[in-house]
Structure formats: C-alpha cells, structure tokens
Swiss-Prot record:
<dbReference type="InterPro" id="IPR007066">
    <property type="entry name" value="RNA_pol_Rpb1_3"/>
</dbReference>
<dbReference type="Pfam" id="PF04997">
    <property type="entry name" value="RNA_pol_Rpb1_1"/>
</dbReference>
<dbReference type="GO" id="GO:0009507">
    <property type="term" value="C:chloroplast"/>
</dbReference>
<feature type="binding site">
    <location>
        <position position="91"/>
    </location>
    <ligand>
        <name>Zn(2+)</name>
    </ligand>
</feature>
<dbReference type="InterPro" id="IPR000722">
    <property type="entry name" value="RNA_pol_asu"/>
</dbReference>
<keyword id="KW-0862">Zinc</keyword>
<comment type="subunit">
    <text>In plastids the minimal PEP RNA polymerase catalytic core is composed of four subunits: alpha, beta, beta', and beta''. When a (nuclear-encoded) sigma factor is associated with the core the holoenzyme is formed, which can initiate transcription.</text>
</comment>
<keyword id="KW-0479">Metal-binding</keyword>
<dbReference type="GO" id="GO:0006351">
    <property type="term" value="P:DNA-templated transcription"/>
</dbReference>
<keyword id="KW-0460">Magnesium</keyword>
<protein>
    <recommendedName>
        <fullName>DNA-directed RNA polymerase subunit beta'</fullName>
        <ecNumber>2.7.7.6</ecNumber>
    </recommendedName>
</protein>
<keyword id="KW-0150">Chloroplast</keyword>
<dbReference type="Pfam" id="PF04983">
    <property type="entry name" value="RNA_pol_Rpb1_3"/>
</dbReference>
<keyword id="KW-0804">Transcription</keyword>
<dbReference type="InterPro" id="IPR007080">
    <property type="entry name" value="RNA_pol_Rpb1_1"/>
</dbReference>
<dbReference type="GO" id="GO:0005739">
    <property type="term" value="C:mitochondrion"/>
</dbReference>
<dbReference type="GO" id="GO:0000287">
    <property type="term" value="F:magnesium ion binding"/>
</dbReference>
Length: 668
C-alpha cells in the first residue's frame, strides 16, 4: 500500500472548477490499467444481496469496497492479500480494488452529461454572473437556458433565406435549407448555446472596451455641456430653467445607471482575469458525484432503508441524462429532445440548489429534498455547524437571566453545570485533601452530592475565570471572561450592563460557557478578557457599557419626585441618615419631598438665584429661602446651617454613587 504523504498548505481558495479538474476528482486508473469513475446507472443497492450495484451510485469499483480488504464477489478477503504491498490488488472477477473501506468517504465519481447545463448559482444568483458577463438581461438568458423563447435567430435566417432570389429553386433544395436552419436553431438553444457564447467571449478585449466606454462617458457628459446647447445664448425664465434642469436630472440618472452597470460588469470580468477562471466553466458538462459515505443509505429495523436526499436527486439526474443520450442516438424529434434537455437542466438545478428556480422538489413525505447548497449553507450547514461550531470539552450551554446582585466581572453559574465543568479540578482537590482515595471514590462523592462537595467546588472556582460566549461572535467582545458565582437553578446569571457587548437580552437567549484549563489561559482570561477590562468598543472607541432600558427606568423612578405632594407640609431632618431611617420605618416614601440639613458644598447655581424670601429674626440672624435651598447666617454673615430640598430616593441614589466612586462628594 502506498504510504500517505503529508501536504503542507498555507490557505484554501474556493474557485471555479474546470471540467478537467472535475474529471480529475472523479476518475482514477486502477493498477490493472482500467479507468473507473463514471456513474452510469441510477441504482443504489441490490434488493436481494443488499450489495451495491456496479456502475451505480454506491458502486464498489468506483468508490471502493464496503468492507475492509474485501472485494465485491468475495474472492479476496482479509488483509493478508494486500499486506506490505505498494500496489493495491484489483479483483480479476469483479474489478474492485482490495483496500480499506475508508476511501468511500473521499473518493468521488462523475457523470458525463449528454448536454451542457448552466450552474444555477451563476444563473439565478444576485447578480446573475452569466447575464452580466454576456451583457444580456437575465430573463433573456433564462429563456435560452430553459427553452422558453421563440428564437429570433431562426426567424432572421428564414427571412434572409427568402430574400436570396431562391424562389425559383426546386422544393427539395428549399426543404434542405430549412432543415439546415433548424439545425442552426438547435445549436443556439439551452446550455450549449450559453457555453458557446461564453467560450467565444474575450475577457481582456471586453474589459478594455468597457474602460474606454467609461472614460468616454465621463468626458463627454458634464453639467456644463448639457446647459451649453443651442439655447445657451438665450436668457431662460424660471419655468424653462426648471424644465431643463429636470431633463438633466433624468439624463444624469440614466447615465449613472449605465455607468454602474458597466462598473459591475468590469469588476466581474477582472475577477475572472485575476483568478484565471474561464467563463465557460459556469456551464457544466461533467457533474461531480459525492462520495457514498457522505450520502449514506442505512438499513432500519424491519428491512426498510433510510437514504440521503442527495441519492434521489442524483438518481433523477442520471435517469434523465441516460434518457437524453438515448433520444440523441435515436434521432428523436426536436421537441422531445428539447423537453428532455430542459428536464435535465431542472434536475441539475435541484441537485445543486433545490428551490432556487421556483418550486422545490419534494420527497414522499412532502418535504423539500435537501440539496448540495442546503448541506453547506445556514446555521445547520457544514461550515457553521461542523467547521466553525465544533463541540469542545469543558463547555456548557444554558439560558441567561439577569443577575442584579452581581458585580460587573461576575456571572452566576448553576451548581449542576459547575460540578460537571470543574469535575477534574474537584476530583484532584478531593484526592489531595484526603477526602477520597482514588478517582472512583471522588466520583462517588460527586454522585452522592455530599455537603463537603460544595465547599470544595467553591474553593476550586476561586480565582478560576470562565469564558462566556454568545453566538454569533461578531467581534472580540462576543467572548468575555467572568468570575463564577455558584447559584441555584439551571440558568446562567449575567450582569445587565454587559448585554450590549454580547448583543444579548433576556428573552430566551442562550450562552455558552468555556473553562480555560492551563495556567496561561487563565492568566490571559483574567488580564485581557475580564468584562471589567472591556468597557470601550474596539470599533468606535466609545463606551459599550452603558445603562439602558430597565436600569434607566429604575434610576428615573428612584430620583423623581411626586408632584402631587407639592404644597403639602414639608418634613425637616437634621441629617441624611435620619431621612434613610424614616424611610426604613415607612414614615416617608421614595418620592416624599424633604428638607435635610447638609454640611457639604452646594452647587453655586442655587446661590446665584434670587431668593424667594428673606427672614430676619430678633437676634439678627438672616434666613435666605430659595426654591430648593435654604441657608441661615449670623449678623457677621457667617454660615450657620443650610438645608437642601430633595427626596429619599435621590439620597439613596447619591449614596450608591458615592460608595462606587469611594470618595466624598464635593457637591450634591
């Protein structure tokens, strides 16, 4: 057996595949010189022997043996026939290569189409690359591909034929020429017509012509040239000026549309030139067939089989392709051949992207068949589901709920989830502290949920950050680190201020939890990824941590005052603590207007206002009464006391801010 070679590569590029490349994928030469790879039959397995049919969709000669080191007929079995051999053995009777069955996961086949068909992505996509390249409306291209039009070329040929002074020829010559015209009409229909048009398309010459047209268009048309016409010497009144300006705007809009169309066409042509792809590769003459292990057929209980939808789509293509080849050999009527070509085009469209053209093909259960595009696109597709979104160990997932008692860098982790995620660390700690003799004993403690377990778990999670991720991760703040806090229930608790960074809300969103294992990963998470260290948006530099929704509403509710209490008897307190005490004793509510003695610095805007009332007592003390402020001074103008008008809610709000800032306020 040939040893496997390691191939090093730097990147993967997705490009158009040429017919030669597709043939190279699905065609191989066996050690006996036989060339295999073409799938010519639509059968899958034999209903009696349950073995794959030869030259079918599961053929062992094309894709490899079903069982390791065993051919189709059973002549070669076990590994001893191929041990220490650089050249694989091919069975002389059935032609199957005696090799491992794992090759059925990557060996491809191919179908040679009896008539070229267009690739539905490049015909029905936005933009339609085929129509843009050819400079034709997409509807006209579709009419040619699906045989929906009356060919203008055929009528042109007939009119040209009738004007060539041939009216006096015999009927046999006229009939021969009309048949020749019919043959010419056949050459310009369907995918074959598109293929010939694309094959004869000169990319570089067309690109140069478009550049010249763009330059000429820019130079020839300016606003000044439009207004400097034959009436440029006349003084225009307002109505004439408005009409001419309106005409110019219409012409400018038309010119911009033409310019954008040329730029779009030039951009696509430049991509073809840069990548080395040829436009005719958008028309398929050879269709690749996926390896059978990627479209399996599984036997169920009771003898029934479950098969991939791709097998039904491939079967439809093969049946129509074989029928078209048979009709071509039979010299069938043109209308029948056209209908079969159109059906072949539709079957290939359904295989590549079912439902792209219109109504999707459905199976026996009335559910649309899953095509090749459906396998790779979307959330459940190959890229997002299997390549970008692989499942990893030491991770979990749950619904998020708000955690109002958490700090910004903390998250609430359910105990049930935490014991599973941190289980290796818990087992290690249980053994080190002598609470368990081995791993089996430690797992028994975990299964029994002993009270000592939660103490050990709290000890383990101290200083061990976890990573929270919400899909889709559109920027780096989609994954942040938090210190876990054990909570009851099964939901992850999240601080509401970090929701904008994750673009999350609490209407059922789910988030994933990942555990950094190594010391380096934990250090990186703590220093770089902690939520309290990511306050600014990496895109704009603006704060991404900002209160919103219920937080803003709560702050407003806390600091508002009840206007219905205006004009009632005011309450006076000698300190802020007395106000809080009265609120705790339910003597007043959050919105009660109170006057409280305050010894701090008052904002100067209150003092600059004119007082509402000035009182002077018998001792010469002066009281200045403002709308929200009162102060009392002695006869030497020394401040004795000052009161401010506020509410208990504002006092609580101010204390929370003071405690978070951890400094004495300079103003209230």
């Amino acid at each position: 057996m040939i040893p496997k070679k390691l191939v090093h590569f730097e990147y993967i590029q997705i490009n158009l595949a040429s017919p030669e490349r597709i043939l190279q994928w699905g065609q191989r030469t066996l050690s006996n010189g036989e060339i295999v790879g073409e799938v010519t039959r639509s059968e899958t397995i034999n209903y009696r022997t349950l073995k794959p049919e030869m030259d079918g969709l599961f053929c062992e000669r094309i894709f490899g043996p079903v069982k390791d080191w065993e051919c189709h007929c059973g002549r070669y079995k076990r590994v001893r026939y191929n041990k220490n051999s650089e050249i694989s053995i091919v069975c002389e009777r059935c032609g199957v290569e005696v090799i491992e069955s794992g090759v059925r996961r990557h060996r491809m086949g191919h179908i040679k189409l009896a008539s070229p068909v267009t690739h539905v992505w490049y015909l029905k996509g936005i933009p339609s690359y085929i129509s843009v390249i050819l400079g034709m409306p997409r509807k006209d291209v579709e009419n040619i591909v699906y045989y929906n039009n009356n060919d203008s070329i055929s009528f042109k040929n007939i009119s040209q034929f009738l004007t060539e002074n041939r009216f006096f020829s015999n009927s046999t010559d006229i009939l021969d020429d009309l048949l020749n015209i019919k043959e010419k009409e056949e050459e310009i229909s369907g995918g074959e017509a598109i293929y010939k048009m694309l094959k004869n398309f000169d990319l570089k010459a067309t690109a140069q012509k478009i550049r010249e047209d763009l330059a000429e268009n820019e130079a020839a048309w300016t606003q000044s040239s439009f207004f400097n016409g034959e009436d440029s010497d006349w003084v225009l009144d307002e109505n004439q000026w408005n009409k001419k300006n309106q005409d110019w705007q219409i012409e400018e809009e038309r010119r911009n549309k033409k310019r954008n169309k040329l730029i779009k066409r030039l951009r696509i042509i430049n991509h073809f030139i840069a990548t080395g792809a040829k436009p005719e590769w958008m028309v398929l003459s050879i269709l690749p067939v996926l390896p059978p292990e990627l479209r399996p057929m599984v036997q169920l209980d009771g003898g029934r089989f479950a098969t991939s939808d791709l097998n039904d789509l491939y079967r439809r293509v093969i049946n129509r392709n074989n029928r078209l080849a048979k009709l071509n050999n039979m010299l069938a009527p043109e209308i029948v051949v056209r209908s079969e070509k159109r059906m072949l085009q539709e079957s290939v469209d359904a295989l590549i992207d079912n439902g792209k053209r219109g109504k999707a093909l459905v199976g026996n259960n009335k559910i649309p068949l899953k095509s090749l595009s459906d396998i790779i696109k979307g959330k459940q597709g190959r890229f997002r589901q299997n390549l970008l979104g692989k499942r990893v160990d030491y991770s979990g997932r749950s619904v998020i709920v708000v955690g109002p008692n958490l700090k910004l860098h903390q998250c609430g982790l359910p105990k049930e989830m935490a014991i599973e995620l941190f289980q290796p660390f818990v087992i290690h700690t249980l053994i080190n502290e002598g609470l368990a003799n081995n791993i089996k004993g430690a797992k028994k403690i975990i299964q029994n949920s002993d009270p000592i377990l939660w103490e050990i778990l709290n000890q383990v999670i101290q200083g061990h950050p976890v990573l929270l991720n919400r899909a889709p991760t559109l920027h780096r703040l989609g994954i942040q680190a938090f210190e876990p806090i054990l909570v009851e229930g099964r939901a992850i608790q999240l601080h509401p201020l970090v929701c904008p960074a994750f673009n999350a809300d609490f209407d059922g969103d789910q988030m994933a939890v990942h555990i950094p294992l190594s010391l380096e990963a934990q250090t990186e998470a703590r220093l770089l990824m902690l939520a309290s260290s990511n306050l600014l948006s990496p895109a704009t530099g603006l704060p991404i941590i900002s209160p919103s929704q219920d937080m803003v509403l709560g702050c407003y509710y806390l600091t508002t005052e009840d206007i219905r209490l205006r004009g009632t008897k005011s309450h006076y307190f000698s300190s802020l603590e007395q106000v809080i005490m009265a609120y705790d004793q339910k003597k007043i509510n959050l919105h009660t207007i109170v006057w409280v003695r305050f010894s701090g610095i008052i904002d100067s805007k209150y003092i600059k206002q004119n007082p509402i009332e000035i009182r002077v007592d018998s001792l010469g003390f002066v009281s200045y009464i403002y709308k929200n402020y009162q102060m009392r001074k002695d006869f030497k103008n020394n401040l004795i006391s000052q009161y401010i008008r506020t509410t208990p809610g504002r006092i609580l709000f101010n204390q929370v801010i003071q405690n978070s800032l951890d400094y004495s306020p300079s103003e209230y």
